[in-house]
């Protein structure tokens, strides 16, 4: 399997990503039998529910110390001690201390909404023409709403991929007034790069939720959470119609990998130069929640 590399934003160094369950992932996405099996698993919600149920059993706590050690997770960031987690899923949906993720300041600054690996595209229209294994990415399929497609078709898009070892709570990238969340039911294909290299439209096929954010600094912003392999549960903790500050929690994913997508209208945001540079090279940038994502272009 080709090693996945990304840029660590804190050090600006190229790093090889540690893949959880690497042998299993290689089998599922590099062999004919594995691909057939992964498709079966992704299309079966009952298997996802069973997996989720298992990870909520108390005996799964035994996996936590080894998982933390293998993935070099900083336990000093946690609100709870390792012994306080009731299950592996409880650990997976962990909360962090506020000081663990400082929020970039400035009314005209938007921030990264999750811990994860980021790809940034300033022009969705150009990205929409990208062909991945002869399959075009479709904004229309992703959003399922002609009004939203027209609104964001010439705007910008942020993809943030969360690995299994990441902190899995998602946050608002801007000061905003969020509307209600709309759910589009779908499958639970993996969003790991090994799966995306064959079909970027996985984002358009997976279960996902959409929330429109009203903002003063950036105009309207569209926020999507995309489920992935074994992630059937996207939990919203915010209240529609209440004002939130950037960095405030919006919700969390239950166990599995997942993705957050944020869309901006045309002429509303200038993304940070390092994120754009890395994305143009085809490299994800691994960021922590609350870091600067870009600045407003609106007066």
Swiss-Prot record:
Species per Swiss-Prot/TrEMBL record: Chlamydia abortus (strain DSM 27085 / S26/3)
Pyruvic acid (Ser) found at: 258
Predominant subcellular localization, coarse grouping: membrane
Free-text description of this protein's post-translational modifications in UniProt: Is synthesized initially as an inactive proenzyme. Formation of the active enzyme involves a self-maturation process in which the active site pyruvoyl group is generated from an internal serine residue via an autocatalytic post-translational modification. Two non-identical subunits are generated from the proenzyme in this reaction, and the pyruvate is formed at the N-terminus of the alpha chain, which is derived from the carboxyl end of the proenzyme.
Site entry: Cleavage (non-hydrolytic): 257-258
Record-annotated disulphide pairs: none
Free-text cofactor note: Binds 1 pyruvoyl group covalently per subunit.
Reaction it catalyzes: a 1,2-diacyl-sn-glycero-3-phospho-L-serine + H(+) = a 1,2-diacyl-sn-glycero-3-phosphoethanolamine + CO2
Active site as annotated: 115, 171, 258
Name of protein: Phosphatidylserine decarboxylase proenzyme
Pfam families linked to this entry: PS_Dcarbxylase
């Amino acid at each position: 399997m080709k090693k996945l590399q990304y840029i660590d934003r804190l050090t600006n160094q190229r790093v090889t990503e540690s893949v959880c369950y690497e042998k299993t992932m290689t089998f599922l996405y590099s062999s004919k039998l594995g691909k057939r099996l992964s498709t079966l698993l992704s299309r079966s919600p009952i298997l996802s529910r069973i997996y989720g149920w298992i990870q909520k059993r108390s005996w799964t706590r035994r996996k936590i110390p080894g998982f933390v050690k293998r993935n070099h997770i900083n336990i000093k960031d946690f609100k709870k001690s390792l012994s306080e987690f009731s299950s592996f899923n409880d650990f997976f949906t962990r909360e962090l201390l506020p000081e663990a993720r400082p929020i970039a300041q400035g009314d005209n600054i938007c921030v990264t909404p999750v811990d994860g690996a980021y790809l940034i595209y300033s022009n969705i229209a150009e990205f929409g023409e990208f062909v991945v294994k002869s399959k075009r990415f479709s904004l229309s399929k992703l959003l399922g709403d002609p009004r939203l497609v027209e609104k964001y078709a010439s705007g910008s898009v942020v993809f943030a991929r969360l690995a299994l070892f990441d902190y899995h709570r998602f946050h608002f990238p801007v000061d905003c007034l969020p509307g209600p969340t709309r759910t589009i039911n779908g499958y639970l294909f993996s969003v790991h790069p090994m799966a995306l290299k064959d079909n970027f439209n996985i984002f358009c096929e997976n279960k996902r939720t959409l929330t429109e954010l009203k903002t003063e600094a950036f105009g309207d912003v569209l926020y999507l959470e995309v489920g992935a392999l074994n992630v059937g549960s996207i939990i919203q903790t915010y209240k529609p119609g209440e004002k939130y500050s950037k960095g405030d929690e919006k919700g969390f994913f239950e166990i599995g990998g997942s993705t957050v997508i944020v869309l901006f209208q045309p002429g509303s945001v200038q993304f940070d130069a390092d994120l754009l540079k890395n994305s143009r090279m085809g490299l994800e940038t691994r960021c922590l929640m609350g870091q600067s994502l870009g600045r407003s272009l609106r007066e």
